[in-house]
Regions:
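Active-site cofactor/substrate anionic-group-binding motifs, chiefly glycine-
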Residues: 1-22
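Non-transmembrane, aqueous-exposed alpha-helical and coiled segments at domain scale
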Residues: 195-205
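Glycine-rich, mobile lid/loop segments that gate access to catalytic sites or pores
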Residues: 37-83, 89-94
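Hydrophobic alpha-helical bundle architecture
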Residues: 152-167, 172, 176-191
Length: 219
């Protein structure tokens, strides 16, 4: 009964929910749970490098399974809370841009909330010192399992020759990680729209990808 479920049904498309790291056990059809949530990145790394790699591998495995079933195009999406924070952190490090210029209001933060968000990202980056030349290190230290899984899907697209469509900001950050790991992945990544998050335009420009709509879903 979710909006995405209804849209998929109307368009005769299938949806595959995946549990990458929910804090509780779920009944989703595909369980790739790597941890019961990530850690507080303002106090230490969000996850271990091993967990980040497992997340990437889970995404690649999903593409392999769907490729074996005959799917010829895939799209990514996520349901997360607070994941524009991790995405802005990852984008800021990988693009070597100031946190203030890469961070937006997400689902509708107040001005005070935005300041707290920016400060939290700055603290996490200063504490963990992610290496901008090592996308997996950045993912592990200030990213999330949702981002890892989707980055793996984009990598899987390159491995199996299947185009993968980016959704919003979090999905774009995942695609950026995939491209930093494997530049050839770019040839299999398609943009659907550009998010209103400040970093979105810079990410698409960096990837050399063109979007066709400005969705602005929260307005």
């Amino acid at each position: 009964d979710t909006s995405v479920g209804v849209m998929c049904k109307q368009n005769h498309a299938e949806i595959f929910p995946v549990d990458m790291g929910m804090v509780t056990d779920t009944k989703v059809r595909t369980d790739h749970k790597i941890a019961y949530g990530t850690q507080n990145m303002t106090k230490g790394p969000a996850m271990t490098r091993e967990q980040a790699v497992k997340g990437l591998e889970a995404g690649i495995d999903m593409v392999r399974e769907l490729n074996d079933k005959g799917y010829r195009i895939l799209a990514t999406g996520e349901m997360g809370i607070g994941n524009t924070t991790t995405s802005s952190a990852v984008a800021s490090v990988l693009l070597k841009q100031p946190v203030e210029e890469m961070t937006g209001r997400g689902a509708g933060l107040t001005s005070e909330g935005l300041v707290r968000k920016i400060n939290a990202i700055k603290k996490a980056i200063a504490l963990n010192e992610p290496d901008p030349e090592d996308a997996i290190d950045v993912l592990a230290k200030v990213g999330g399992l949702d981002i890892a899984g989707m980055a793996g899907v984009f990598l899987g697209g390159a491995v199996y020759g299947i185009p993968v469509v980016m959704d919003g900001f979090i999905s774009c950050v995942s695609a950026l990680i995939a491209m930093r790991i494997c530049p050839a992945a770019r040839d299999y990544i398609l943009a659907s729209h550009v998010s209103k998050e400040p970093a979105a335009h810079l990410i698409l420009e960096n990837m050399g990808t063109v979007s066709y709509t400005h969705l602005r879903a929260h307005e």
